[in-house]
């Protein structure tokens, strides 16, 4: 893992241009209706189908202007036999990030009364390579963070219709993914206060990840709280990913990732702590990583710099493949996941490492 100062990056475009609440019932949630606008441009109408007003954080969801994963894309091998096996998911090439769990700004919150809706248009070619064209099936489901008193207090489920479109590959290639538009020139390492803070965070991440890996190998109450299953295979999977994170965090001149001290690509929205571009194994910290987070938390399940760095490392497939997603932010949402989703959730590892470190 190499860490880089902001001045060392030339990011340019290529010439191509209180009590936890868990709303999880079949009659309550958000319904997403997907439709095609033009080729790879998609419109989503998000409606509150429940009987009460809800407020949620729309970061990493529809209405987020950054290239986040709003939908899943699939190819059918019967129609595209050379490129994929049956119903293969198209690789996501956008960004993933960790957000603050409290002190949330109005700018990242959406409130919907019963029956109310909002629209969002986005281009799926910015987060997936669709240059080969052909039929693509699109759908979306998951949960979005429920917010009360400006803090994440649970989750709201959402689901969509299934939409199949015919993609013009030549047109899609003109859009290009986020990763394809990034050129990097590495000139020097992080320096100053931010460089020192990141070095400390990396050292702490090594310690936390190693402790958590050892604890995961043994299982126990904290393990089942986050990962539900105490089987040897689950313990081995968690331990292996955490060991890989420790190894990567301890390698500041090599490894698989490049770590930037500041927002190199311009995706640090309000309340975003750090982000990862998995297709490039690139990680970048945002300003509030330094201004809002302590080096290490002294309270169970609070956020800090070390676990935020650990969170981002789990997103990077170069550290441990496949990289994780963001399926549940914060303790309430993370501990409500089943085993499969917990193993694929970045915050589950970060929160578990915090729990082991503090003896929660």
From Swiss-Prot:
One of its GO terms (biological process) is proteolysis. The keyword Aminoacyl-tRNA synthetase does not apply. Keywords: Cleavage on pair of basic residues, Disulfide bond, Glycoprotein, Hydrolase, Metal-binding, Metalloprotease, Protease, Secreted, Signal, Zinc, Zymogen. The active site is at residue 312. Belongs to the peptidase M35 family. Residues 1-18 form the signal peptide. The keyword Protein transport does not apply. Zn(2+) binds at residues 311, 315, 326. Residues 19-184 form a propeptide. Its EC number is 3.4.24.39. This is Neutral protease 2 homolog AN3393. Disulfide bonds join 190-261, 268-286. Binds 1 zinc ion per subunit. GO terms for cellular component: extracellular region. PANTHER family: NEUTRAL PROTEASE 2-RELATED, PTHR37016. It is found in: Secreted. Secreted metalloproteinase that allows assimilation of proteinaceous substrates. Shows high activities on basic nuclear substrates such as histone and protamine. It holds the Pfam family Peptidase_M35. Its cofactor is Zn(2+). Its main location: secreted. It comes from Emericella nidulans (strain FGSC A4 / ATCC 38163 / CBS 112.46 / NRRL 194 / M139) (Aspergillus nidulans). It comes from the Eukaryota. It catalyses: Preferential cleavage of bonds with hydrophobic residues in P1'. Also 3-Asn-|-Gln-4 and 8-Gly-|-Ser-9 bonds in insulin B chain.
């Amino acid at each position: 893992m190499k860490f880089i100062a902001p001045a060392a990056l030339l990011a340019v475009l290529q010439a191509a241009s209180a009590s936890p609440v868990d709303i999880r019932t079949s009659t309550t949630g958000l319904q997403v209706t997907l439709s095609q606008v033009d080729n790879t441009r998609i419109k989503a109408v998000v409606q509150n189908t429940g009987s009460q007003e809800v407020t949620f954080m729309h970061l990493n969801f529809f209405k987020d202007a950054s290239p986040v994963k709003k939908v899943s894309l699939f190819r059918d091998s019967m129609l595209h036999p050379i490129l994929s096996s049956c119903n293969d998911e198209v690789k996501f090439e956008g960004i993933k990030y960790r957000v603050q769990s409290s002190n949330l700004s109005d700018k990242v919150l959406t409130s919907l009364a019963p029956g109310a809706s909002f629209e969002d248009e986005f281009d799926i070619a910015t987060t997936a390579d669709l240059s080969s064209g052909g039929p693509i099936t699109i759908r979306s489901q998951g949960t979005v963070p429920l917010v009360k008193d400006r803090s994440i207090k649970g989750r709201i489920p959402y689901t969509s219709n299934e939409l199949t479109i015919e993609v013009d590959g030549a047109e899609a290639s003109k859009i290009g993914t986020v990763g394809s538009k990034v050129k990097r020139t590495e000139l020097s390492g992080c320096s100053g206060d931010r460089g020192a803070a990141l070095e400390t965070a990396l050292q702490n991440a090594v310690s936390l990840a190693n402790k958590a890996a050892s604890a995961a190998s043994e299982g126990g109450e904290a393990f089942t709280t986050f990962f539900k299953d105490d089987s040897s295979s689950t313990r081995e999977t968690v331990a292996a990913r955490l060991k890989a994170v420790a190894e990567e965090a301890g390698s500041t001149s090599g490894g698989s990732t490049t770590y930037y001290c500041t927002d190199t690509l311009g995706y640090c929205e309000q309340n975003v702590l750090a982000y990862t571009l998995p297709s490039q194994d690139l990680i970048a910290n945002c300003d509030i990583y330094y201004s809002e987070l302590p080096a290490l938390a002294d309270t169970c399940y609070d956020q800090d710099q070390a676990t935020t760095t650990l969170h981002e490392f789990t997103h990077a497939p170069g550290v441990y493949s496949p990289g994780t997603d963001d399926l549940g932010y914060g303790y309430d949402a993370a501990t409500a996941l089943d085993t499969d989703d917990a193993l694929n959730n970045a915050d589950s590892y970060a929160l578990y490492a915090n729990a082991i470190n503090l003896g929660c």
